[in-house]
Structure formats: structure tokens, C-alpha cells
């Protein structure tokens, strides 16, 4: 493998055996591609904004005399960039401008004669834009739109599994689900009649819908039944015979033909009899007259002479009717062929319960069901039925729906109309009847072929369409009303409903979620999340076990591991690593094609629908060098089941071993050795890891760390290759390679880094450069590390030296004992940034004022404020300190005449003010790192705001000037080379000022042209600089657009450094979580023979019952990796020559059985080897991919290479006594995470505070400054101890005895520690409740 200069700094040793056929795809593509489809111009008009416009426009007036047509749309440029939107608290969006055409037709002239056409561009609101990382900035906060897994439109056949009716009879049903429009259900009842429901209303006999489509009884019977024809000849009855139809019946008479008896009376007719009859071509037999009684006629029979109906279609025949038919000359009678086995008489039976007999009565019946209480008219009834399923405005199956519908009914074509046809409805009924008759199977609704993904773009399009439909009504009204000659398109359109619909979706939809920004992994996982909840999806309460369960079709599409614990389990899933959606929105996963028994590198993406038919081998199947299967029998998947197949039968093979799992689960090394429940916890807890002060790459990883770090967007990645020309903490400048430049540009890329910014979860986002001056970089190299990344690899925690042993009960029940060294080295120290805002409003009594002049506040409290009343940057503040001084006008108090007089004389302040300053919340302390002031337009800016503005202007100017200088330098370097090539001497040039270079003339015409082009570029560059500076200045100095009634907002940012402490929650990556019980002095920790103490002591009893053995293997492999690092470190310290280092490192990389990674250090320069060694001395990072990881043998070999015992266990000594522990202990390196459940955030104590209104008990929870609930069980505990007085005060004065508690408070203030319990308020509530039941309960006095 070829490594770039940056990648050579640290190479992770890979233990994977299977070759990587397919690189991990870009992990955010599901979000970005979907939104791109939504906003890009689509000439086909299949999806996105274009489709929404085309589906609503043209809008015609009611009279048809005019229409508003859609021409095209364009998105403008956003006003602010992403960072500015976040600071200002506004939405990152672009204005949508639509070109519309108003066409007015002549009234009197023939149809379609145009009188007037007006075209105009109309503003239609703002469309939020997606940032490069797949998020939206809505009102200044980053949000993610989660994809939804919903039931695909189409037709589904299902059964109630015998649960509905007491008899346990299985009732079948069919449901046609459109993309939008009314649902149509067909269902059988226990009597086997077929019913229809529209939109889950009350049911009607299914034949009503056929009658409404203008079918007569006879036509209905023709559609669903085969015929049996009886003929009357010479008073004898003959029947046309189809032998197959007799199968399984018992002969009620001798079946004979041509004098030969085939079946005797009373015998069961078998397949042998049928073959005999078919062989002799018997197609007509004589039957006794009684046989026809009870058969059902297939059409109306009319007496030719009188014209009266002898028997109507669907009537049962009797011998009397037969005689009348015979008399009136009907010699052949058509009857319906039915039997109990596989040709039920369902439709015939349903027709008997159907109260309607013609189209009108059927339409009226449907109208009554849909609109009960309204009087039906013919027109209304017809319109309603037409609009239900046959109107493109009201009903749409969508392309997906039509495809699924046609597939379900085994039709050839997959495309067709979005509305239903008569044939569609009849075919669904036929298939349902076939299923009831035992032919065909019901669908599995949890199959991923029946559930599809709705991503951002599609949901936004639907919302946008909703807005357009609201506008459509208004436009129709306007087109019909007024004087069209004076109106323009923009007078027709009101953009409010559209922006409201879009805003509501992005701001408050259930699927628009506040981004989880704990660390890069939680961001990526959130964007790849797939939820079954949300509008048009399931609800938590109603979702059963089946929907939540893992389904065979999840393989390679949805992760079986990563899902939340709790009520949402199984409803919220994560996309698998390689999964993607196809054009229809179904999830597909890649497979390698097997051609003629050879596994090729050709990749096919298959959806769950297509996958079932193939035989698919697993990724770890053994192949030889040519790609043939080694074994004869191979474990494969087929139709969702695993079984053994011959190697010739295999058609596809998995792409990778980690294909099954999601990104989160693919980061757990040795996942294959962990129990599923613990792996689930591990995957979920990695997302809660807080970025530590110094990121530390995991010694034992899986090889996915780089992909996650780069794709998450927290790192700064090189867009083009080049050389690092300048680097400092806040910017990196790259001089781009010649071959990657665009013609006519300076060839400089500038990357500005994010410094100490607050994330959504109050953690710290900070980027640090990881390249040095003069280093070559290639496209895609990581230039700067973000939070939780280390040299471009994800680094969520720290590598800790752990020992598995009990230690004085301090690690009882998953507690964790930590060494003080961990605190001293700041291994788990994290920075948290809080934003506190102070809003100054315009009140009825006057404006609130931000000032340092606050009533009744001492000097000390104001010591940290400047003259504007705002805290200065760098101040150390603690709970209760004032950050922003603010006073609010108080209502006029009634003054006494004397006061009025004094006021009149001395002209004191007319009204009073009260202190409403922004203070630091209790329990919070930190350093002020930034202050921002936003002032409304037209309100005078205070001194601090002007200072901030001045500083921002200076910074902007400095940044832009530096940028210009860098670009100029690049440009003049090129000008110089052109001039020198044109024959001008370098010495002369360097004596001239640079600006004069452009005035020089060259003899060579081509060179002169180049020079002129460069001069033009120089002018453009300066003009661009002025323009940028102007725009920046305007943005900084303009007033801010604040909410109504708000004059000023001051935002103060506090940074808090939190060290690890007892009560904090920590975890490994295998679901092994615990709480820190004690921070132990270094000298008391167990140490080994070299005197190295361990950092963390874990309880060995936490492993066996939980079956997450992965952590033990990780510990051993971590030890080996560290051992190799230690040896490299020793060699570096002894300053051994590079050749020895090269040899040892090469040996380490080569270790392992047939691993796929080939690192050839002979291609590295000495300098590169030394730098690699420097980066490896803390431990050699190792990748052990999921399901393809290091084997036990390889771990032992690596331990041996690091001169460590192959058992992975060493002798430890007790730090307090120096005695040896009696047996060896497993010691190694485990990657530990500090989770965002910090004791500082949870610690809370209540003195006195707010009480609940009714019960008068203290509120609960930290946010309400509440108390701890002393519940039922706690009361039992005190009762068991007989602690009567403690119990009494718990239930009275400490809770809801109102008088008692006030008296007690007074007593404590007076220094008198006595209490008198009274009547608890909750007892009074109980009395009231009993009285409300009509029982008068009274307390008797003594």
C-alpha cells in the first residue's frame, strides 16, 4: 500500500486477513445526496423542488379564463455563512426565487387564444441549506434531520393470525397504501364475506366498490368465477366436465361415460381417477337431476314469451326453477363453479349481503359512509368517489408504490400511472381471494423490501408541497376575483404559508433533532440514524415486538447491534457501514459477484427484494489465490435462512466482515467475542464519550478510526495537494501543486481553524494543526485535528494501564479504582463551555438597561464588570457572581405627600428599578472566554459593543490583509518566473518594487500575454479584497435582527475545566461501565516488578457473567502494543542506528498469519523511519477489524516480540505493604472513556425552595431546585428500624406540613432547635378526594 507523507507519521498495524475489496464509502452521503437531490435543478422533474412545483402548477382559475404557470426557480446566496449564523442565532438559508408566468385567455375567442402573458420572478421564502457536514443551522443551533423508515406505498396482503375472532379462524386482508391519498382495505369476515374499508372507516360489502365502478352482478360473477354448463336433453341432465375440478370430492353418483364406470358412487375421486378421465378425453357426463339443486346461476334467465326474469344472476337453483327454465326453452344453464377446497363462493356470498343493486345506490352508500349526516346528491356522490382513487390531485401511488404494486401482483412492467385503475382494484381482490383459497402467501411487513427510507430531501419536498397546496387555494381565489389586467404574479403569491410549512418542518418536526455533538462519532451516528417513529411512522406505545426485532433482511443494511435501550429499542436503528439507498428509497448492500465459481471484484448492490433469490456466501469464506472456494460445502444465506450449499451454487459473496454492523459497532475491537447486549451498550456509550484535553489514539482499534474522524468533518482536510507554506494555531496555508491548480489562480489554499467553540452538548470544539512548515501534503490528508482526534484518527478516550483484581472493596459492583496519576497527568480532564445570555427587553414601564449602576449591590460584586456593566474576558467567576448588570423598571409605588414633596424639590429618579442581572448559576464556576453583544437596529451601542466591533473589524482586516499578502506572494512568484523566462535579469528585478514589475514590457509576445493576464489577476485580487473587506465591515457594523421587543442581547461564554473525580462515569468499549469510587494515591496502587504502578483497577467479577470477553483480549493486545512501543523507546534512548530500528519495526509489522497489510519500510527515508519511531514509542497502534481480528496465537507472538509473558499475566505487589499478591494478575492496556454523566452536573442539594401547588410537597429534580423523594420503600426502612421521630419529621416538617416548616425555619434562625409537627397537606388532599367520592369524612377533635 502507498502511504502519503502525512500517513507515514503513524501507521496502524492491521491484523485483518480478508482483502479490502471496497473502501468504506463516504459516511454522510445519505444526508448530503438526499438534500442535493432536493435543491438541484432536475430537468426531468422527478424529485426535489422541481417536482413539487410541477405537481401544483399550473394553477387555473375556476372559470378557466386564466392560469398561473411555473417556469423555473433559482436559489440565491445566503446572507451569512454558517459560523455567523451560529453566533447570531439565525437560520442558515437561501432565498428561493421562482419565475412564474400569468397567462390570460380571451373570453369570447375560441379556447386557448391568449390575450396577455406576464412573466415575473417571485420571492417564495427561505429554504434552509445543509452545511458541508450534513447538518442544518436553525435559529443558530445545529440540527440533524433523521431519516425515517416507513412502510413503502404499494399493496400488502396480510392476515390477523387468527387473533380477531374467538374461533381462531385466520382472516385475510389486503391494503393498498398510496404515497398520499386514501387507504383502501379489503378484508374477510368470519363468515367469509369480503368487505372493503376506505380510510379505516366502517366496512361495506366489497362488491359495492365494483358496482360503483359500473359493474353489473353478471359482470362481477364473470370476473371472479369459472363456469360449469349443464345441458337439458330429452329430460336428461348433462354436465360439461373438467376432470381436474373433481379432485378431492366424493362421488354422489356413478361417474360413467361411453358405458364405462370410472368412479363408483360414494368413492373419493383421486388423482388416478382424474388421469383416467383425461386420458379417455371424457368432457361430458350425465348427472342426476338432484345434482343441480343448490348450484348458483351465473347470469339472468328471462322467459322469452313474457319477458319476466325466471331467475336472476347469483340465485340458487331448485328443481322448480329447473322445470320452469326447461319449459321456457333454455336448454343450457351456466352455473358458478365453487367448492370448499380451493374455489370458495366468497364474492357470490358477498353479493347476497350487498344492499345496493346499481351504480347510483353504491355511490350513495359510499358517500354516506365517508360523510355521515350529509344529504347525498348524485353529483356529490360521483365526485367523491372519483376523487378518492382516480384523481391525480388527491391520490398518488408514486413510482415506488406503482413498482411495489405491480411486483406484488406479478405484473411484468414496473412503471405506470400514480392513480388506481379498475383492473388494479379487481386484481387485488382476485389475489386476496386466491390467498384465502390457499394459493399464495401473505407478505411479511417487517421485511426491508416492504419498508423504505425517507431522507431529508424527500421530507422537505413533501413539506414544501404542503405549503404550495395552501398557496394554490389562495391563488385560485385571486385569479377568479379581480381585475387581472393590473395584477402581476407577485400579487398572487403570498410566501408566508410556504415559509411557515418549511420552518415548521425544520424547527419542530419530530425528526428534526438537536444534533448530538458530544464527539465526532456521535455526530456521524446521529446523521446515519434511521427512525421508525415520526409523522407517518409508528408510535412507541403501539409498536409491537415484531417491528422492533432483528429481521434477516437487516443483514448489511441496518445494524443489529446499535439501538437505544429503553422504550425506543428496535425503533431507532443505525445504517450499516456499506449500506446505501437506491432510487426507490430501499436500502441496498454491496456483494461481490461470483462468476463460474470464481469470486470477482465486481460489486453489485442488492436490495432486500432482490437479495432473497440468491445464494450468498459470507465474507470470511476461505478462498485460494485465484478466488476459488477452498471447501466443497459453504455456509450461505438464501431466502433469509443460513444453510450449507455446494460451491457451484454460490452466486454472490459478502464484501467485508464489517458489512453487518454500523459505524459505532465497527469501532469495537474483538466485537465477535462480546455478548450482543453488552456490545449494544458499548456502541451506545462510545457516543457519550467527552473529548479529553489531549486526545490519545486507541492502541487497539479496528481500522475504522481514520474514516470516522475524516468523514465527521471535525478535522481540517486538504482539498488539494501541495506544501505547507505557513502554519499557526488558527490557520494553515498550503501552496498548491502545479498540476492541481485551476488556470489563472494564485494557487494558495487557506484553512482557518475553529478555536475553543461551544458544541451543542457544551463540550469544547478546538482544532490543532498536525502538519509542520514545509511538509508535503496530499489531497485528503488531515491538516488539523479536531476534538477527539489524534493525527487524523478518532480518539474518544485514553489508553490506561488496567489490572483485573479486587482491591479492598473499592471496585465492588462495577466501581472503578483510579490512580492519582491519572488526575495529575490530566488524562481525563475535559473542557466544558457554557453560554449564558442576558436579554434586555422593552417593558411596559420602560426599557431594561444594561449598566454597572445596580441598586443595593456592593463594590465587590461589581469588581469584575467594566463600565458598561459587562464582565471582562478572562475573569474567574463562581456561582452567584454578576456577569451582566441589568436593571428593570419597577411599577410606580404609591408615595406619601412628604415623599412627593421631597421628590419635587430634589428631582430624584422618577421611578424605581430592580436588579435583574445575569448571574452565574449555582454550582458553576469557570473563566469568561468570550463576550458578544447584539444590539437592535436603531438602538445606540454601548461602549463595550463598540469595542467588540472595533476588535472584530481589526481582526477581519488583519485576516484579509494576511490572506491578500499570501495570495500576492504566490502571484508575484509566478510573475517573477514569467519575467525571468522573458529575459529580464533577477538582480535587476529584485531592485525594482514589486508593483513596477507589471509595467515592464517583454519582447516575447506569448510571455507578454501571460504577464498581462497575471496583471489582470492582480487587479481582480485587489478588487476582490476591497469587496470582501467592505462586506465584512457591513456585516459587523450593521444592527442585529432581534426578536420583537428585544433591545440587546449579551452572550457570555464560560469555560470550565473538569478533572476526573469520584462519582464520574467511565466505560470501556465493550459495555463495561462503572463509576469511580476512589482516587487512590500513586504509592498505594499495585505495581509490577519494574515498579510501574497500574492506573486503574477493575473488578474481574464484572467479566464472566456479562460475557464481554473482548475486553480481556483488548487488554492483552494493548499490553503487547505497549511492549513494542517500550522497546522502540529504549532503542531511541540508546540512540541506536536507524537500520536496527527499521528492522525491528518491520518485524513488528510483518507479524501475523497472512495479514492483508504490507508495510515496506525500505521505501521510507531514514527521517521518515525516525519520525514513525517517535510516534510509535508510546505503543504501536493496532487494528483488529470486526469479525476478522487478531487470533490468540498472534496476540501471543506479539507479546513475545515485546518481551512480555505470553499468559498476559504478571506478578503485582501491594503498594501499601510491598507484599506480593498471591497469584498473577491480568495487566494490560484498555481504552477507557469518560462519559458525559459527570457528578458535577448531577450533584445537588436543597435547602428551602419551591413547592408543588396542590400537595405542597417540594418539587423534584435539579432544574427545579427540588428535593429527594422519600418514597414508600424508604418509609418501610425507617419503620423497620423503629426510627419514629426521624420518620415523623420526614413526613411532616421536611415535606408538606406548611405551618410546621415555616415555624421550624423561624426557630432555626432564632437558634432554637425545636420542632412541632402539624398536619401534612397531603392528608387534607386525601380528605378532599374522599369527599369528592360523596363520603363525608371529618376529623373528630379530642
UniProtKB/Swiss-Prot annotation:
EC nos: 2.7.7.6
Subunit structure: The RNAP catalytic core consists of 2 alpha, 1 beta, 1 beta' and 1 omega subunit. When a sigma factor is associated with the core the holoenzyme is formed, which can initiate transcription.
Function: DNA-dependent RNA polymerase catalyzes the transcription of DNA into RNA using the four ribonucleoside triphosphates as substrates.
Molecular function in Gene Ontology: DNA binding; DNA-directed RNA polymerase activity; ribonucleoside binding
Stored CDD domains: RNA_pol_B_RPB2
InterPro entries: DNA-dir_RNA_pol_bsu_ext_1_sf, DNA-dir_RNA_pol_bsu_external_1, DNA-dir_RNA_pol_su2, DNA-dir_RNAP_su2_dom, DNA-dir_RNAP_su2_hyb_sf, RNA_pol_bsu_bac, RNA_pol_bsu_CS, RNA_pol_bsu_protrusion
Organism in which the protein naturally occurs: Photorhabdus laumondii subsp. laumondii (strain DSM 15139 / CIP 105565 / TT01)
Family: Belongs to the RNA polymerase beta chain family.
Alphabetically ordered keywords of this record: DNA-directed RNA polymerase, Nucleotidyltransferase, Transcription, Transferase
Record-linked NCBIfam families: PRK00405.1, rpoB
Gene Ontology CC annotation, any one: DNA-directed RNA polymerase complex
Name listed for the protein in its UniProt record: DNA-directed RNA polymerase subunit beta
Catalysis: reaction(s): RNA(n) + a ribonucleoside 5'-triphosphate = RNA(n+1) + diphosphate
PROSITE patterns, sorted: RNA_POL_BETA
UniProt record, GO biological process: DNA-templated transcription
Amino acid at each position: 500500500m502507498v502511504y502519503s507523507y502525512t500517513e507515514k507519521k503513524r501507521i496502524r498495524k492491521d491484523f485483518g486477513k480478508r482483502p479490502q475489496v471496497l473502501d468504506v464509502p463516504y459516511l454522510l452521503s445519505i444526508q448530503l445526496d438526499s438534500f442535493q437531490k432536493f435543491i438541484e435543478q432536475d430537468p426531468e422533474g422527478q424529485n426535489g423542488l422541481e417536482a413539487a412545483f410541477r405537481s401544483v402548477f399550473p394553477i387555473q382559475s375556476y372559470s378557466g379564463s386564466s392560469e398561473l404557470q411555473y417556469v423555473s426557480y433559482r436559489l440565491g446566496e445566503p446572507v451569512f455563512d454558517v459560523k455567523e449564523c451560529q453566533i447570531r442565532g439565525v437560520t442558515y438559508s437561501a432565498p428561493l426565487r421562482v419565475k412564474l408566468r400569468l397567462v390570460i385567455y380571451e373570453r369570447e375567442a375560441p379556447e386557448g387564444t391568449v390575450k396577455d402573458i406576464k412573466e415575473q420572478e417571485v420571492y417564495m421564502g427561505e429554504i434552509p441549506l445543509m452545511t458541508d457536514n450534513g447538518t442544518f443551522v436553525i435559529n443558530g443551533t445545529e440540527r440533524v434531520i433523521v431519516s425515517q423508515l416507513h412502510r413503502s406505498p404499494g399493496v400488502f396482503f396480510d392476515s390477523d393470525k387468527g387473533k380477531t375472532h374467538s374461533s381462531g379462524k385466520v382472516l385475510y386482508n389486503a391494503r393498498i397504501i398510496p404515497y398520499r391519498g386514501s387507504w383502501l382495505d379489503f378484508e374477510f369476515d368470519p363468515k367469509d364475506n369480503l368487505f372493503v374499508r376506505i380510510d379505516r372507516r366502517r366496512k361495506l360489502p366489497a362488491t359495492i366498490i365494483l358496482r360503483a365502478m359500473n359493474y353489473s352482478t353478471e359482470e362481477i360473477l364473470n370476473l371472479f368465477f369459472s363456469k360449469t354448463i349443464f345441458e337439458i336433453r330429452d329430460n336428461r341432465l348433462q354436465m360439461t366436465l373438467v376432470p381436474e375440478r373433481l379432485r378431492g370430492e366424493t362421488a354422489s353418483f356413478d361417474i360413467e361415460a361411453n358405458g364405462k364406470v370410472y368412479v363408483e358412487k360414494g368413492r373419493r375421486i383421486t388423482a388416478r381417477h382424474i388421469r383416467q378421465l383425461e386420458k379417455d378425453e371424457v368432457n361430458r357426463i350425465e348427472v342426476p337431476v338432484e345434482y343441480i339443486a343448490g348450484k348458483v346461476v351465473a347470469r339472468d334467465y328471462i322467459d322469452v314469451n313474457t319477458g319476466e326474469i325466471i331467475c336472476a344472476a347469483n340465485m340458487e337453483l331448485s328443481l322448480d326453477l329447473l322445470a320452469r327454465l326447461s319449459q321456457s326453452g333454455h336448454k343450457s344453464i351456466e352455473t358458478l363453479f365453487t367448492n370448499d377446497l380451493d374455489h370458495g363462493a366468497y364474492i357470490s356470498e358477498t353479493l347476497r349481503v350487498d344492499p345496493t343493486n346499481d351504480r347510483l345506490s353504491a355511490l350513495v352508500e359510499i358517500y354516506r359512509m365517508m360523510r355521515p349526516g350529509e344529504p347525498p346528491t348524485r353529483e356529490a356522490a360521483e365526485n367523491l368517489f372519483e376523487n378518492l382513487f382516480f384523481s391525480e390531485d388527491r391520490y398518488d401511488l408514486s413510482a415506488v408504490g406503482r413498482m411495489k404494486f405491480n411486483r406484488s401482483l406479478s405484473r411484468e412492467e414496473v412503471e405506470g400511472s400514480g392513480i388506481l385503475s379498475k383492473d388494479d382494484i379487481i386484481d387485488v381482490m382476485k389475489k386476496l381471494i386466491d390467498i384465502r383459497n390457499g394459493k399464495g402467501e401473505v407478505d411479511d411487513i417487517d421485511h426491508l423490501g416492504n419498508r423504505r427510507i425517507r431522507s431529508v430531501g424527500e421530507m422537505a419536498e413533501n413539506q414544501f408541497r404542503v405549503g404550495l397546496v395552501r398557496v394554490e387555494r389562495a391563488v385560485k381565489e385571486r385569479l377568479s376575483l379581480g381585475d387581472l389586467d393590473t395584477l402581476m404574479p407577485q400579487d398572487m403569491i403570498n410566501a408566508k404559508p410556504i415559509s411557515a410549512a418549511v420552518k415548521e418542518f425544520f424547527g419542530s418536526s419530530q425528526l428534526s433533532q438537536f444534533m448530538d455533538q458530544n464527539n465526532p462519532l456521535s455526530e456521524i451516528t446521529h446523521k446515519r440514524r434511521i427512525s421508525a417513529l415520526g409523522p407517518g411512522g409508528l408510535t412507541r406505545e403501539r409498536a409491537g415486538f415484531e417491528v422492533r426485532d432483528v429481521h434477516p433482511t437487516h443483514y448489511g443494511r441496518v445494524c443489529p447491534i446499535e439501538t437505544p435501550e429503553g422504550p425506543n429499542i428496535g425503533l431507532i436503528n443505525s445504517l450499516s457501514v456499506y449500506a446505501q439507498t437506491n432510487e426507490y428509497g430501499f436500502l441496498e448492500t454491496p456483494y461481490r459477484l461470483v462468476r463460474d465459481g470464481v469470486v470477482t471484484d465486481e460489486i453489485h448492490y442488492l436490495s432486500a427484494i432482490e437479495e432473497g433469490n440468491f445464494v450468498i456466501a459470507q465474507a470470511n469464506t476461505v478462498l485460494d489465490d485465484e478466488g476459488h472456494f477452498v471447501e466443497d460445502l459453504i455456509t450461505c444465506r438464501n431466502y433469509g435462512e443460513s444453510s450449507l450449499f455446494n460451491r457451484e451454487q454460490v452466486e454472490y459473496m459478502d464484501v467485508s466482515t464489517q458489512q453487518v454492523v454500523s459505524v459505532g459497532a465497527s469501532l469495537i475491537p474483538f466485537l465477535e467475542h462480546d455478548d450482543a447486549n453488552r456490545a449494544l451498550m458499548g456502541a451506545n456509550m462510545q457516543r457519550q464519550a467527552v473529548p479529553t484535553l489531549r486526545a490519545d489514539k486507541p492502541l487497539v482499534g479496528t481500522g475504522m478510526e481514520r474514516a470516522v474522524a475524516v468523514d465527521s468533518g471535525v478535522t481540517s482536510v486538504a482539498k488539494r495537494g501541495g506544501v505547507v507554506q505557513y502554519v499557526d494555531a488558527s490557520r494553515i496555508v498550503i501552496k498548491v501543486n502545479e498540476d492541481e491548480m485551476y488556470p489563472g489562480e494564485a494557487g494558495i489554499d487557506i484553512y482557518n481553524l475553529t478555536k475553543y467553540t461551544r458544541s451543542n452538548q457544551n463540550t469544547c470544539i478546538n482544532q490543532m494543526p498536525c502538519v509542520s512548515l514545509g511538509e508535503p501534503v496530499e489531497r485528503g490528508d488531515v491538516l488539523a485535528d479536531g476534538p477527539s482526534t489524534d493525527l487524523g484518527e478518532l480518539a474518544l478516550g485514553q489508553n490506561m494501564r488496567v489490572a483485573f483484581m479486587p482491591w479492598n472493596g473499592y471496585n465492588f459492583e462495577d466501581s472503578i479504582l483510579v490512580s492519582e496519576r491519572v488526575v495529575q497527568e490530566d488524562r481525563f480532564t475535559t473542557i466544558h463551555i457554557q453560554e449564558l445570555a442576558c436579554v434586555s427587553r422593552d417593558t411596559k414601564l420602560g426599557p431594561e438597561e444594561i449598566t454597572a449602576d445596580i441598586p443595593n449591590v456592593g463594590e465587590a460584586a461589581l469588581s469584575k464588570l467594566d463600565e458598561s456593566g459587562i464582565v471582562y474576558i478572562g475573569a474567574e467567576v463562581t456561582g452567584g457572581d454578576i456577569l451582566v448588570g441589568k436593571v428593570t423598571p419597577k411599577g410606580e409605588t404609591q408615595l406619601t405627600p412628604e415623599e412627593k414633596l421631597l421628590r419635587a424639590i430634589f428631582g430624584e429618579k422618577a421611578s424605581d428599578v430592580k436588579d435583574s442581572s445575569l448571574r452565574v448559576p449555582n454550582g458553576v464556576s469557570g473563566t469568561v472566554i468570550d463576550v458578544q453583544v447584539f444590539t437592535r437596529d436603531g438602538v445606540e451601542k454601548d461602549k463595550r459593543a463598540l469595542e467588540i466591533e472595533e476588535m472584530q473589524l481589526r481582526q477581519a482586516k488583519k485576516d484579509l490583509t494576511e490572506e491578500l499578502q499570501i495570495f500576492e506572494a504566490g502571484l508575484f512568484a509566478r510573475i517573477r518566473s514569467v519575467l525571468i523566462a522573458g529575459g529580464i535579469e533577477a538582480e535587476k528585478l529584485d531592485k525594482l518594487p514589486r508593483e513596477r514589475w507589471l509595467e515592464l514590457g517583454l519582447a516575447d509576445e506569448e510571455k507578454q500575454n501571460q504577464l498581462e493576464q497575471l496583471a489582470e489577476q492582480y487587479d481582480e485580487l485587489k478588487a476582490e479584497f476591497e469587496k470582501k473587506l467592505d462586506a465584512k465591515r457591513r456585516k459587523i457594523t450593521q444592527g442585529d435582527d432581534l426578536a420583537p421587543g428585544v433591545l440587546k442581547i449579551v452572550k457570555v461564554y464560560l469555560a470550565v475545566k473538569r478533572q476526573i473525580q469520584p462519582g464520574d462515569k467511565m466505560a470501556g468499549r465493550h459495555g463495561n461501565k462503572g463509576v469511580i469510587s476512589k482516587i487512590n494515591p500513586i504509592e498505594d496502587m499495585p505495581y509490577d516488578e519494574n515498579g510501574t504502578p497500574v492506573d486503574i483497577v477493575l473488578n474481574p467479577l464484572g467479566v464472566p457473567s456479562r460475557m464481554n470477553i473482548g475486553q480481556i483480549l483488548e487488554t492483552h493486545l494493548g499490553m503487547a502494543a505497549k511492549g513494542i512501543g517500550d522497546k522502540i523507546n529504549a532503542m531511541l534512548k540508546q540512540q541506536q542506528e536507524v537500520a536496527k530500528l527499521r528492522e525491528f519495526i518491520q518485524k513488528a509489522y510483518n507479524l501475523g498469519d497472512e495479514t492483508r497489510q504490507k508495510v515496506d519500510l525500505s521505501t521510507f527515508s531514514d527521517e521518515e523511519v525516525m519520525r514513525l519511531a517517535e510516534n510509535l514509542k508510546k505503543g504501536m497502534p493496532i487494528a483488529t477489524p470486526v469479525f476478522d481480528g487478531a487470533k490468540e496465537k498472534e496476540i501471543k507472538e506479539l507479546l513475545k516480540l515485546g518481551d512480555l509473558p505470553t499468559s498476559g499475566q504478571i506478578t503485582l505487589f501491594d503498594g501499601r505493604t510491598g507484599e506480593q499478591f498471591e497469584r498473577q494478575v491480568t495487566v494490560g492496556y484498555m481504552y477507557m472513556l469518560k462519559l458525559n454523566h459527570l457528578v458535577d452536573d448531577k450533584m445537588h442539594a436543597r435547602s428551602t425552595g419551591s413547592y408543588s401547588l396542590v400537595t405542597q410537597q417540594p418539587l423534584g429534580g435539579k432544574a427545579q431546585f427540588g428535593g429527594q423523594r422519600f418514597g414508600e420503600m424508604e418509609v418501610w426502612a425507617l419503620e423497620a428500624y423503629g426510627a419514629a421521630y426521624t420518620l415523623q419529621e420526614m413526613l411532616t416538617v421536611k415535606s408538606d406540613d406548611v405551618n410546621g416548616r415555616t415555624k421550624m425555619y423561624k426557630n432555626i434562625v432564632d437558634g432554637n432547635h425545636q420542632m412541632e409537627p402539624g398536619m401534612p397537606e397531603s392528608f387534607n388532599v386525601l380528605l378532599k378526594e374522599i369527599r369528592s367520592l360523596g363520603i363525608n369524612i371529618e376529623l373528630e377533635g379530642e
